[in-house]
Amino acid sequence: MKFNPFLEAIKTYESGKDMDLVAKEYGLKEVIKLASNENPYGTSKKAKEAIINNAHLAHLYPDDTMSELKQALAQKYDILKENLIIGSGSDQIIEYIVHAKLDHSKAYLQCGVSFAMYEIYAKQLGVKVYKTPSLTHDLNELYELYQKHKNEIKVIFLCLPNNPLGECLDASAVFEFLEKIDEDCLVAIDGAYNEFASFKDSKKHINPKELIHKFQNAVYLGTFSKLYGLGGMRVGYGIACKEIINAFYKLRAPFNVTNLSLKAAVAALDDDEFVQKTLENNFSQMKLYEDFAKNYKIRYIPSYTNFITYFFDEKNSTDLSEKLLKNGIIIRNLQSYGLNAVRISIGTEYENSRFFEEFSKNF
C-alpha cells in the first residue's frame, strides 16, 4: 500500500514509558517515572472533585463553545474569550499553526533542539525545517536564518522555556526580536513551562495580553499538563488576535476536549495553593539535582522548567537509561534528539532520592 511520501521523513514521537508496563516487564514492585515532566504531586484536590462530581455527564457531548473554561482563562490573562482556542493538549494548537500557515513550498524556523512535535507536524506536510547551529535559543542566529530565508519561513517556534533543554530567554529580548519579524510570519511562543520560568525569574515571564496586543502575528501556547497536573486529561490552549483564532477554528474538529477535561481545567485554575506548592517544591528539589551534577562533574543547562537535562561526554545515555529502567527509574533518553543526554523530571523528595541512589550505583 502506498502512503503519503512525506511520511518517510517523519520519526514517530517517543513518549515516556508506562509505569505498569515497566513493572510487569522487569518484575518490579516499585516504579518511579521521571520521564514525562508530569506533576509529581498528582492532580489538585479541586480538579479531582470536579472530575468526580461531573462523572455522570460522561455520556454527553461537551459544551463545544467551551465557554466556562474560556471565561476562566480570559479572567486569568485579562483578555477576551474571542482571543482563545482550546485544544486537546497544546500539541493540537501546534497542529493548527502548521496547517494554517505552512505547506510543502514553505518552511518554519526553530532553535537547534526543541519540542519534537513542531517538526513532526511540519514534515507531515512536507514543510522544510530551518534550525540554528546552537542547540539553545540564540536570537541572533534565529534572525540571521530568518533574514536569509524569509520568503520561505512563515512560522517561527520559540519554546520558552525550551523542552527538552530547559533554558529560557528574557521576555524583553523576545519582544525586541518580534519587532523585526514581518507581519505575515506567525511566531508561536510555546509557554508550556512558562509559569515555572516566571516563578524562578520574573524577567522570563511572557504576558500573553501584552504579546497579542503588540504583535498581531503572535500566538501564545499554554497547557494544563505540567503545572496543573492534568496530563491525562489533555487540555491546552492558544491565545492570539481574533483573525488567527478564527483561522484555527476552521481546522478544529467539534467536541475535541471532553466534558471532564474541561471541568477539571476550570477547577485547576482555581487551586492556587496546589500551584504554589508545586512551584516551590520544584525549585527546592531542582537545587539538589544541580548539586548532584556538580558533584559528578556532569554538564547541565540551568533549567527554568520542571526538569533538568544532563549531558555526558563518555557515559552513554542509552546504557544509563536502560540500567535505571531495570531498577525501576524511568527517565527520558535524548538520543532521539541526537544528544548523548538524559532529561529528568523533578519528582517528589522520595522519588528524587531514589534517582540519586540508582544513578550513583550505575554511573
Swiss-Prot record:
Origin superkingdom: Bacteria
Enzymatic reactions: L-histidinol phosphate + 2-oxoglutarate = 3-(imidazol-4-yl)-2-oxopropyl phosphate + L-glutamate
Requisite cofactors: pyridoxal 5'-phosphate
Enzyme class, UniProt record, top EC level: transferase
Molecular function via GO: histidinol-phosphate transaminase activity; pyridoxal phosphate binding
Keyword Amino-acid biosynthesis: yes
GO biological process annotation, one example: L-histidine biosynthetic process
Sequence positions bearing N6-(pyridoxal phosphate)lysine: K226
Keyword Transferase: yes
Keywords for this protein: Amino-acid biosynthesis, Aminotransferase, Histidine biosynthesis, Pyridoxal phosphate, Transferase
UniProt pathway: Amino-acid biosynthesis; L-histidine biosynthesis; L-histidine from 5-phospho-alpha-D-ribose 1-diphosphate: step 7/9
EC number: 2.6.1.9
Similarity comment: Belongs to the class-II pyridoxal-phosphate-dependent aminotransferase family. Histidinol-phosphate aminotransferase subfamily.
Subunit structure: Homodimer.
Name assigned to this protein: Histidinol-phosphate aminotransferase
Record organism: Campylobacter lari (strain RM2100 / D67 / ATCC BAA-1060)
Taxonomic placement: Bacteria, Pseudomonadati, Campylobacterota, Epsilonproteobacteria, Campylobacterales
Gene for this chain: hisC
